[in-house]
Amino acid sequence: MATPEKAAAVAELTDKFRSSNAAVLTEYRGLTVAQLKTLRRSLGENAQYAVVKNTLTKIAANEAGITLDDQLFAGPTAVAFVTGDPVESAKGLRDFAKDNPNLVIKGGVLDGKAMSADEIKKLADLESREVLLSKLAGAFKGKQSQTAQLFQALPSKLVRTVDALRAKQDEQGGAE
């Protein structure tokens, strides 16, 4: 039977899984408290990094409708719950792991879909949402200006063709 404390912890973790855009599971063995504080700061304001109990986390994920591989729960585990841009937090974890090899990214969840550690690293390689949206807007603007130039070119080409035909007819008419 679960104690009230464990039930409350599971309820809190379940709520975090449901309210987060992403959750990244990591192994933190060998990191100091100071390093964990630095990691929390590097994740940004839209992420919470918490050391969790594996069994309670697995139960909470299942209650949130998320199926995670049992291998993700081997060893000491901490979870980064991301409520903002998942790319920003994934970059923070990746960059911190480069400098601190004791941090191991195990895998995670993005919008309810389980992701491997490699997929999390690929997510970190993406540009931020704002940059991608600005590139998309630039592409649309470029296409619109090309389309406008095309529509402007068609009538002017038609006018030049008609003028050339008129000039040719005038030459032929004048030569007769």
Curated annotation (Swiss-Prot):
It comes from the Bacteria. GO terms for cellular component: cytosolic large ribosomal subunit. InterPro entries: Ribosomal_uL10 (IPR001790), Ribosomal_uL10-like_sf (IPR043141), Ribosomal_uL10_bac (IPR022973), Ribosomal_uL10_bac_type (IPR047865), Ribosomal_uL10_CS_bac (IPR002363). One of its GO terms (biological process) is translation. Coiled coil: none annotated. GO terms for molecular function: large ribosomal subunit rRNA binding; structural constituent of ribosome. Keywords: Ribonucleoprotein, Ribosomal protein, RNA-binding, rRNA-binding. Gene3D superfamilies: 3.30.70.1730, 6.10.250.290. Part of the ribosomal stalk of the 50S ribosomal subunit. The N-terminus interacts with L11 and the large rRNA to form the base of the stalk. The C-terminus forms an elongated spine to which L12 dimers bind in a sequential fashion forming a multimeric L10(L12)X complex. Forms part of the ribosomal stalk, playing a central role in the interaction of the ribosome with GTP-bound translation factors. Belongs to the universal ribosomal protein uL10 family. This is Large ribosomal subunit protein uL10. It comes from Streptomyces coelicolor (strain ATCC BAA-471 / A3(2) / M145). The gene is rplJ.
